[in-house]
UniProtKB/Swiss-Prot annotation:
Protein name (record): Gamma-glutamyl phosphate reductase
Protein purpose: Catalyzes the NADPH-dependent reduction of L-glutamate 5-phosphate into L-glutamate 5-semialdehyde and phosphate. The product spontaneously undergoes cyclization to form 1-pyrroline-5-carboxylate.
GO molecular function terms attached to this record: glutamate-5-semialdehyde dehydrogenase activity; NADP binding
Taxonomy of the source species: Bacteria, Bacillati, Bacillota, Bacilli, Lactobacillales
One matching Pfam family: Aldedh
Family from the record: Belongs to the gamma-glutamyl phosphate reductase family.
Catalytic reactions of this protein: L-glutamate 5-semialdehyde + phosphate + NADP(+) = L-glutamyl 5-phosphate + NADPH + H(+)
Keyword Plastid listed: no
Primary localization class, coarse: cytoplasm
Organism of derivation: Streptococcus gordonii (strain Challis / ATCC 35105 / BCRC 15272 / CH1 / DL1 / V288)
Gene: proA
Pathway entry: Amino-acid biosynthesis; L-proline biosynthesis; L-glutamate 5-semialdehyde from L-glutamate: step 2/2
C-alpha cells in the first residue's frame, strides 16, 4: 500500500506535465482515456461485481444502484469524457487586459489550480468524471474513493492511466489513494503545500468533516435538501409531472426533491392526485412507491406517515417525501430559507409576480420556475460532466465545470518602468 504522503510527493513531481500541457495534448489524453475505459470494461465490471457483492446487505438498494455499473453506464462515462474535448479550454484565457497611464499592460489570465484532491463515496462515475475534468482544466488529481467502491475505482483509474501512457502527460497525474480509512481522508485535509484544492463529494457527515477540519482550501459540495413549492396559481398537471420526475427518476442523487410545499388553498384537489401518482399508480405498476411523510394539515387530506420535525431537514436519498402545507408564498419562502441547503429549489406557478418573488428571495445555487430540479447537473447545464454542485458562494457556485477548476494570475508587461 502506497502511503498518502508518497502519493502527494509523486504527484508534485509530475504535475507540470499537465499544468503546462497544450489544449491539443489534453484533448488527445481525454480521447485515449475514453478509449481505454471501453477497452477495459470487462475488468471494470468484474471489479464492480466484487464491490457489489461485498456491499449487499450493508447499504440500501438505492445506494447499491449508485454503486452498480453495466456496459451502458461505462459507455456513458466514456462519452462524458469525450464531451469535454469539445468544450473550450479555460487555461490561458485572458479575462481582462488594461493599459495604465505609465505604459504597463496588465493581463488577467486563467491558470490551472495545480493539484486537486477529491474525497468521495460510492459513485464510480465520479472517478472518471473527476479525473477528466481535472486534466482538461490542467490539473493533476488525487482521488480517494469510499471503501464500498474501491475495487471499481481502482479498475477505472488503471484504465485511465493506460490512456495517459499513450500521451506526453504523465500517468502519475492521476492518483488513487489505496487507504480508504479515515486516516487517509485526514491526511488529504491537512495536505497544505501538496493539494491546492480539496472537494468532498458525499453525504452530510463527510462534507461537514472536511469543511471543519481541512487546512487545504475547500469547495463545499452541499447535500441536497431540495424543495418544490406548488403555488395556489400552479398548473396542477405540470406540478405533478415535475414532482414525479424530481422525486422518482433517481432519488439517490443530490438534485432529487426531498420536501414538497403545497399552498393550502389547492390542497383538497391537489394532494389526492399527488398520492395517486406517487403511491397508487406506482403500486399498480409494481414500481417502488413513495412514502409520504405528512404534516398535520396535509394528513387531513391523504394518508401517509406522520412527519417529524427532522424530516424537513433530511436528505433522504430514497423514495421518501416530506409534505407540508403553507398558507402563502411568503411562508413557503421562509420555510425554504430556514431548512434548505441552498442547492436547488423550485416553484410551480403561472403567476409571474410569484415566480419573480421566489427567484429573488430564495438564496440557492439553482432556483427553478416550472421545471424539475433534476436539471442541476453539469451535463444538463452544458458544462460537460461536473466535479460536483457547490452550495457555497466564494469562487464557485452550482455545477462546477472547467472554469470553476481554474484560478487566475496577473501578467504585467513593461518597458522598464520603475515605481516612483
Amino acid at each position: 500500500m502506497t502511503s498518502t504522503q508518497a502519493i502527494f510527493e509523486k504527484v508534485q513531481k509530475v504535475k507540470k506535465t499537465i499544468n503546462t500541457a497544450t489544449t491539443a495534448e489534453k484533448n488527445l489524453a481525454l480521447e485515449e482515456m475514453a478509449k481505454q475505459l471501453l477497452i477495459s470494461r470487462a475488468d471494470i465490471l468484474a471489479a464492480n461485481e466484487l464491490d457489489m457483492t461485498a456491499a449487499k446487505g450493508k447499504i440500501s438498494d438505492v445506494m447499491l444502484d449508485r454503486l452498480y455499473l453495466d456496459e451502458e453506464r461505462i459507455a456513458a462515462m466514456a462519452e462524458g469524457i469525450r464531451q469535454l474535448i469539445d468544450l473550450e479550454d479555460p487555461v490561458g484565457q485572458v479575462l481582462e487586459r488594461t493599459k495604465l497611464d505609465n505604459g504597463l499592460v496588465i493581463s488577467k489570465k486563467r491558470v490551472a489550480m495545480g493539484v486537486i484532491g477529491i474525497i468521495y463515496e460510492s459513485r464510480p462515475n465520479v472517478t472518471s468524471d473527476a479525473a477528466a475534468l481535472a486534466l482538461k482544466s490542467g490539473n493533476a488529481v488525487v482521488l480517494r474513493s469510499g471503501k464500498d467502491a474501491y475495487q471499481t475505482a481502482l479498475a477505472i483509474v488503471t484504465a485511465l492511466k493506460k490512456g495517459l501512457a499513450q500521451t506526453k502527460i504523465s500517468p502519475d497525474c492521476i492518483q488513487l489513494v489505496s487507504d480508504t480509512s479515515r486516516a487517509s481522508a485526514q491526511a488529504m485535509m491537512k495536505a497544505k503545500g501538496y493539494l491546492d484544492l480539496l472537494i468532498p463529494r458525499g453525504g452530510a457527515g463527510l462534507i461537514q468533516a472536511v469543511v471543519e477540519n481541512a487546512t487545504v482550501p475547500v469547495i463545499e459540495t452541499g447535500t441536497g435538501i431540495v424543495h418544490v413549492y406548488v403555488d395556489k396559481d400552479a398548473d396542477q398537471d405540470k406540478a405533478l409531472a415535475i414532482i414525479e420526475n424530481a422525486k422518482t427518476s433517481r432519488p439517490s442523487v443530490c438534485n432529487a426533491m426531498e420536501v414538497l410545499l403545497v399552498h393550502e388553498e389547492i390542497a383538497a384537489a391537489f394532494l389526492p392526485r399527488l398520492q395517486k401518482i406517487l403511491v397508487t399508480d406506482r403500486d399498480a405498476a409494481r414500481e417502488k412507491t413513495v412514502e409520504l411523510r405528512l404534516d398535520e394539515k396535509a394528513a387531513q387530506y391523504i394518508s401517509g406517515s406522520k412527519a417529524r420535525p427532522e424530516d424537513f431537514d433530511t436528505e433522504f436519498l430514497d423514495y421518501v417525501l416530506a409534505v407540508k402545507l403553507v398558507s402563502s408564498l411568503e411562508e413557503a419562502v421562509e420555510h425554504i430559507e430556514a431548512h434548505s441547503t441552498h442547492h436547488s429549489d423550485a416553484i410551480v406557478t403561472e403567476n409571474d409576480a410569484a415566480a419573480a418573488y421566489f427567484t429573488e428571495q430564495v438564496d440557492s445555487a439553482a432556483v427553478y420556475v416550472n421545471a424539475s430540479t433534476r436539471f442541476t447537473d453539469g451535463g444538463q447545464f452544458g458544462l460537460g460532466c461536473e466535479m460536483g454542485i457547490s452550495t457555497q458562494k466564494l469562487h464557485a457556485r452550482g455545477p462546477m465545470g472547467l472554469k470553476e477548476l481554474s484560478s487566475y494570475k496577473y501578467v504585467i508587461q513593461g518597458t522598464g518602468q520603475v515605481r516612483k
